[in-house]
Amino acid sequence: VARTLRGAVTGGLLPEGTRLPGHRRLAGALGVSRNTLVDALAGLEAEGYLRVQGRSGTVVCVPAAEAAGPLTAAQDLPLSAWASRALSGGVDDAGGEYAVDFRVGQPVPELYPEAAWTAALARQAGRLGRRTEEGKFSDPLGPLETRRALSAYLNAARGARVTPEMVMLTGGTQSALDALARVFLEPGRVAAVEDPTYPGARAALAATGAAVVPVAVDAGGLQPTHLPPQATLLYLTPGCQYPTGVTLGAARRAELVAWARRGNAFILEDDYAADLHHTGRPLPVMQGLAPDRVILLGSFSKSLAPATRSGFLVAPPPVLRVLARTRPLTDRAPGTLDALALADVLDSGAYGRHLRRARQVLAHRQEVLLAALSEGLPGWAVQGAASGLHVYVRLPAGLEEAQAVAAAARRGVALSPVAPLSATGGPAAVLLAFAHLPPEAIRHGVRRLASS
C-alpha cells in the first residue's frame, strides 16, 4: 500500500496539496483493511509524503529531495576543479552502426592468444595459495617475478636498460599517465605533448591544472626546437607516433634528452604498438639512451587483449620510490593473478610465438588496405605505415576532413577524423584502422569509399 501511494506521489498522479479520502473509503478503494491502511499512511507521513492537517484530513506533500528532482547532468554535481578539467578533455565517439568500420580503437579478438593466456591464468591461480613472501601481494610495484620477466623482455626486445627495481605494473598506459601527472604537475606548471597526439594523454595532463603546450610533428616526428624550455613533462610516442605513424630519428632523440637534462624535465615515452611493428626492426626505446630522464610506458592491451589490463612503467629509482608511496592512495597494488600470468607467457615464450603470428596477420591486412587505397583512391596519401593498427591518410587538396567523414558515413563506412587529436589544426587527414577487419571487408570498405 505504501509503495503504491508513494509511487502515485512521486509520479505526479497525486500532486502536492491533494486531500486524500477518509480512511474507510480509501481502504475500500485499495482493497485493504483499515488497520493496514493506517499503518501505511503513518509510514508515509514519517517519510514526508503526507501531512495530517487536523480535521481537514490527510494532504499530499512532496519531500524536499523529491521536489528538487533527480540529478540529470554533470553541472548538477559539486565537482572538483580536477573533475571539471577531466570532463573537458578527451574525444567523444559518435557511435553508430556501419557496414564497414575503419575507426580506431577496435578490438582484434582473433589475435587474442586465448589458449596460452587461459593456461597461464590456470597455472598461476593454482599457485596463489602457495605464494612465498617473495611474491609480496601488497607490493605497490607488483609481483617481483613479473617485474623480473618484464625487465628481461624489455632489455632483449626493446633495447631498454631496466632492472626489476625500476618497474611498476599498471592497469595500462592511461593509469600510468594519471599517476605521473598527479606526482609532477599542478597549476602553474607546464607539460608538452606532440601535436596531434593521443587525446587521453593530453586530458590526463591537463586535468592537473597544468598548461599543456602542443608541439608540432612533421615527417621526422616531434620538432625539438619548438619545445617550451620550462616544461616539467613531455609526452612522446617516438617509435610509432600516434596518430601519424612516423618514427623519431636518432638525432632528434638525442636533442630531446639534452633538453630534458637542461631543464630537469622527464620524457614520458609511450612505446605505443612497438610489439606489433611489422616492417623491419623498430628502433630501440629512448629509455635505453637515457634511463635517468626517460620514463617508459607500455601496455599489453593492443598486443594481447584489452581485457587483460596489463601495463607497466619504467622509471629512475627516485621516481619509482615516490610512485610506490603515492600509489596506495588510489589502488594500493596491481592485480596479482593477471601479473603472474603475464610473467608466465613472457618466460615461457608463448608471448613471442603469439607476436610472430600477429605480425604476419597485421602485415597482410595492411598490405590489402594499401593496395586497395592505391587502386581505388590514388589521391589519398598514406604515411607512417610501418607499425601500428591503423594508417594515417592525408586527403587530397580541396577535400575537407569533415566532408570526407560525412560522405563515407553516407556510404556506410566509418572513419576516424584527425582534427580532434590536434590542438592547433593541421592538414586534412583521417585514420583507417585495419587490424580488426578481414581482407575482404577492407576491400569492400575502400570500394564504398571510392564511390562516395
Over which residues does each language-model region extend?
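Short helix-loop capping/hinge motifs at secondary-structure junctions, enriched
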Residues: 317-322, 351-352, 398
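Conserved core of the PLP fold type I
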Residues: 121-124, 128-263, 275-289, 293-295, ...
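Helix-loop "lid/cap" segments that line or gate small-molecule binding pockets
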Residues: 150, 312, 340-348
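N-terminal basic, amphipathic alpha-helical segments
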Residues: 1-123, 324, 328-335, 343-346, ...
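Active-site PLP attachment segment
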Residues: 55, 288-322, 334-337
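Short beta-strand "wing" residues that participate in macromolecule-binding interfaces
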Residues: 51-53, 162, 415
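Hydrophobic residues in well-ordered beta-strands that form the structural core
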Residues: 193, 214, 269, 342, ...
